[in-house]
Amino acid sequence: MGKFGGIILILILLMWCCNTRKTVVEFNLIGSSGIQPELVVNGEEREIEVDDSGYAKLMLTEGEHGYATLKYGKDRLPLFIEDGTTLRIYIYGDHAKGNIRFEGDGSPKNSYLNSQVMKNLSFDYELNAPEFLDQLKDLIQEQFHYLDTMGFDAAFAEMERNRIKFSTYKALENYPLYHAWSTGNMDYQPDTAYLSCIKKLIKEDEKLLVLKEYQEGMASLVSLISTYHMKELDAYKQVMAQFDYVIHHLTNETLVEFLIDHYAYAYLLGVGIDEHIDDVLRVYDFYVKDPALRKRFQEIYDRCAKIVPGSPAFDFMFTDIAGQAVELEDFRGKYLFINVWTTWGVPCRYENLAWEKLEKEFEDENIVFVAVSCDNDRAVWEKRVRENPKGEVQLYMGSDRSFMDFYMIRGIRRS
């Protein structure tokens, strides 16, 4: 190649580099008290370091695009990051929901995903099964109609249709229990027509696994169809029924691996390391080979190992109604029954009756019943305790959630 040929080649390469568009996400936090946003793309979590003015610029690499999640404090917002686009995100205050704005060529799809039309889905669980199914169809069609008005490209629109469907399908798993509660018919069981509809909705499509809604929707549908006949709540029987359905009715290896991991992980979170864990691990080890999934599972297994019976208790320090510190050492020589609750939790209020019966049953034993509130507002907790004095020890956790983290308490109430 001659001298001029080499120069032309260099110029072509320079022009190609200049024309290759970067994928950029900019963050502008206005009025924030120091919350650090996090971006989850393709399952990978990235912390965003903003400067003193609340600004951060993130250059994404090839492959870091598609559906994503923005974590901001307790808020979780959907994003769609398009290759070669710039997305500018403005968040006002410490709560992103309802206080977020988008600019740049990546703005339209993200504004759509975070619009009110795509959020406020409510379900009437008192409806009978056919009516409930019709309600879901109407909600899906309503969202489809809104999507069609946006004029997005065909590929995104098709993926969105699947995301909408499986997001809405999640309500199907809740229906039997919520219908029983709302109607007072605690013996309710879904009929064959309802179950037949569920089976038709189970769709194996590996390319949809990039959608969190597809993952959750499929997990819900398979869980419902595999455990509907169980009248008692037995976590071990439930997870083995879920495994059995996945193994004998699904064929896509990637989907099978995902669902086995999903159910085993949920079992570990809910039950911990118990006498049945070896059975769960045998199935898990046979079907789950993905290193990332196994790493995540091992991490939660190691955490569960710290709280098996006989392990040292968490050395907590909370405060009582008078503001005095109360710590684990104060109960040396006693058995503790600790209940984590909040004043606003409806299940907490309903279960108080069972809690009081338990107290009475063991009132002559060497057991101390301790109710620990994780309310954000101490004044609200104090008001409730003073208005409804109970026999148990009442403590306030405050903002430190290390106790809940240690015992992996994700929902309340939890004892």
Predicted features, each with a name:
Residues M1-E26:
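Bacterial Sec-dependent N-terminal signal peptides
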Residues C18-M159, R163-F166, K170-Q189:
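A non-transmembrane, solvent-exposed segment enriched in polar/low-complexity residues
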Residues R332, V340-K357:
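Conserved redox-active cysteine motifs that mediate thiol-disulfide chemistry
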Residues S182-K199, Y236-I247, D274-D285, F314-D315:
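Alpha-helical repeat scaffolds
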Residues L208, E213-D274, R296:
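Long, charge-rich alpha-helical interaction segments
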Residues K295-L328, K390:
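N-terminal "domain-start" segment that seeds a small globular fold
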Residues E365-V380, P389-R401:
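Thiol-based oxidoreductase modules, predominantly thioredoxin-like and allied folds used
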Residues K390, G398-S415:
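Thiol/disulfide oxidoreductase modules built on the thioredoxin-like
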